[in-house]
Amino acid sequence: RHTRYYASRGLGDVYKRQDTLFFLFGGKAYAIFSLLFGFSFFIQYNNQAKKGKDFRLRFLWRLFLLFLIGCFNGAFFPGDILVLYAIVGVILPLVCKWSDKAVLITAVILMLQPVEWAKFLYAMNNPDYVAAPGQWLVHHRNMYPFLGQTDFWAMVKSNLWDGQLFSLLWGWGHGRFFQTASLFLIGMLIGRRQFFVDLSGHRKFWLRTLLISVVCFIPLYYFTEALPDLFTNKSMLSPLNTIFSSFRNFAFMCVLVAVFVFLWQQVSGHKVLHGLVPYGKMSLTNYLSQSIIGSFIYFGYGLSLYSELGVAASFGVGIVLFILQLGFCHWWLKNHKQGPFEGAWRKATWICS
């Protein structure tokens, strides 16, 4: 994200590669993580159900802990997603006893972005209506200057207030609340149907998912790109862009997940991907450490390299950080079952149990 603000347009091919990476993972990586969040809830809920225990209240406590972890992360990085997860995650214990059909219908309704459709219809029926600028812009303007200042505690204070409000309001204004809730429910359904457990037995399902997603993604991509030419009224354009960008990202996320499933089933692909398993097991630790290390590298309280590192250098920093984290994950898991933050979260979840 840093490079999209400070990269020089004169970098040509390097900048194009950055845009390619953003095209591949922007809005999709978070979607995959959201899917897995719902899937992990099912695993925990199901494991406790087998013991005759109701996991719902314990999960709400777990979400409260996640909220606190998100605040800690947000103190360093004003783009935290954990607080959003803690808020939206409340939907999981509310619907976990519903039938598959009811959960699927709810997931579809949420994915359709009903609030954005309401905004579009209102703007269409009221041609003189001009939507107010997103409130997140105010908090972004308040927060951004502190990122370059040397006062660490002033930055933390700004990030915890304006930074979190910016992140949450941006998420609301860009359909993330509804899409995240939908992905949570879809992840839970995948767990119920064991689509990630018996991969060979569900090969047809994943093949259909791949083909349908590719067929849907292509027209969605071009339609989204053409929206500014089709709708000059920004009050109509903005919600439509949110809606169809959400659909497009969901379709491409399904492509990535299906491709990953097929690679995992291949011997050569399995060997390569298996080496990344420790990184996934410590995803929370890696996410938090990326925020801490990244903020120190780029923000004013640390090395203040936000205006010095361009696309290529920032990409290099990301690769080096990933390699170091992967090595640490392999080393740590030789003697521990979970990462440090994962272990602390688990222990706090089951406190007084």
Where are these regions (language model features)?
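Membrane helical hairpin/interfacial module
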Residues: 13-78, 82
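Specific transmembrane alpha-helix
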Residues: 31-46, 83-94, 175-198, 248-267
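Long hydrophobic alpha-helical segments that form multi-pass transmembrane helix bundles
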Residues: 109-186
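Alpha-helical transmembrane segments and terminal signal-anchor/GPI-anchor hydrophobic tails
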Residues: 208-264
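Membrane-interface transmembrane-helix boundary segments in multi-pass integral membrane proteins
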Residues: 240-248, 283, 306-326, 330
